[in-house]
Amino acid sequence: MLMSKLSKRVLKAAILFVFGILLLFLIFRNPLLHYVIGKVGDKMKFEKGLTLKIGSSSFSGFSTVALGKVSLIPQSGDTLLIGDMLRIRPSIWTLFTGTLRIKQVEASGIQLRLVNKKNGSNYKFVSEEKKKEKAEKIMANGYSYFIARLLDRAFNFAPQKAEISNASLLFVNDTLKREVRLNKFHSDVNSVKGEFEDVVSNSLWECSGSFSQTAHKLDLYVFPTSAKKCDLPLVNELTGASISFDTVHVELDGYQYSNHELKVFGLASMSGFSFHHKRISEDSIKVKNASISYLISSDANSVMLDSSSVATLSGITFKPFVRFEMSGSRKYSLNLQTDTIPATDFFASLPQGMFDEVRTIEADGTLKFLMSFHLDAAQPDDVVFDCSMKKNKFRIRKFNSSELMKMTGEFSHSVYENDRYIRSFLVGPSNSYFTPYEGVSPYFRNSVLTSEDGSFFYHNGFNEDAFRKSIATNYKAKKFLRGGSTISMQLVKNVFLNRKKTVARKAEEALIVWLIESNRLYSKERMLEVYFNIIELGPNIYGIGEASEFYFKKTPAALTLSESIFLASLLPHPKWFKYSFDSTGNLKPYLANYYRIVSNFMLKKELITQQEHDILLPNVQVVGPAKELILPTDTVLVEEEEIF
């Protein structure tokens, strides 16, 4: 009985306490609101250099905050944000836990203005000091904690109920002005639906789905409603890329954070996807459909796409693993492994615009692709890179539109430079300059192999050791200094593909090299024969036949060791041949080191005798038409290697 009376007293006291708090809130809520707005404004001014201006502020109803004529202005630059009306209803009960959660938002006349001009930007206001401070906080608390806090804030500030109209995003730079309007947006406990418009193209887009603030779930579809397929607005202006699609589906199925470990679950898919960026591909890359069921994991020192994730690219299913670790030094890891797939389906599933030379191939058997990469920034020389295509009973039945067999006989070769047509010529006996493999001086053959690809006759098209060294060298230099292309890769690039320095061209080049080398479509001797007859060795000079005549007025079979090493030295920069000579017509002194390195390797491999090595002089006598083009002035060269 005593306990019952005590419980009633405690309950009454609690009710009175809550009532008192609510009463105080009702009495002092407007002054409290003005105080909070002032503190928020001071914090934004101090941390971001932003001035917050609010024309009017008051409570509407019990807990809804009504703001009018809101603006955010950077210290230097155009206004970042303006808003006519904004109504926000927070969750009162979450405030007692020290957490702000927005339950409902109404807004109209909102415009976010992104200005990026030569004289300044209004959104790049975070200083390097603040970025460094933020990075230090991440390292102190760990990646998992930082990402979990971001997700918590995102869901707390994304209201379950929202009604937005007449909102827009404006992007302005020195040459253009682009606007995307959010005509309407509605969200409640059951659904999300919105419509936005690209003002320039008049294209309309819709989004629909569901959202749960408390369960931390999002299921959203985005698709264009215009009859004509159009690019996603602002992507090109901000990134230089063009993106279009029929439908994109994004699902976040919740996340868990405990014991400094974070797990994020979800999936994403797209159909009718088209992408273009000049550094990725010359043509638009098109994918019929793609999807990924993902698990993103994070601990204090790392973030990774877990290997349990499963992705599909048209008919190809693969398991990706990506990891970034920051424990002592930065570590990067990437693993890819496809399922075993019928070979014809593999080729047909490759993206259009990226593997067009091989997509129509029909073949028996199965294929499976594997790749492994790991780089420790503290030990880049120990980089791990392994890439392979596993085949089982693989045999090509039909090449269809592919031209991979064009080298079986005489063919026409066209030369382009920077999209400009230079000339065409036949590679075969009909061309008087064509030189069979046996008709090329062994000195020249071995000089080129020594300088360009010493293991050509022993590898399967790829020199992984050279490629690993290239990765390490370029990473340490923070720029491109060294390539890893084999002669097989150079041949494929010049005969079957264009010379555009794009990721797509490099990927297709690798696949074609694998097809040629692993299936012995051509002998190594035939590959070298074609290579020797198409390589550029001077201004508008292509092939060893033309080069031998141009420089020395002789046939390729008669080339000496010194002449051969000289011609091999031209391969990186054939148009600069004249800068190899001084005013007297002799080779410049810096080439003596090149001669020494190449001849030493040739001697070590027993490609030349000790006597040939000892009497070799770093000099040649140019007697052909090239003699008239040699400049009498000294010129300093700045070397530039091809990235791809």
PLM features per residue range, with description:
Residues 1-8:
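N-terminal Lys/Arg-rich, disordered targeting/topogenic segments
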Residues 8, 12-75:
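N-terminal amphipathic/hydrophobic interface segments
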Residues 9-12, 89, 474, 619:
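Alpha-helix termini
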Residues 27, 39, 102, 146-153, ...:
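Juxtamembrane regions of bacterial inner-membrane/periplasmic proteins
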Residues 31-34, 59-64, 77-82, 438, ...:
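Generic alpha-helical scaffold signal
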Residues 55-174, 188-223, 236, 253-262, ...:
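Flexible beta-edge/linker motif
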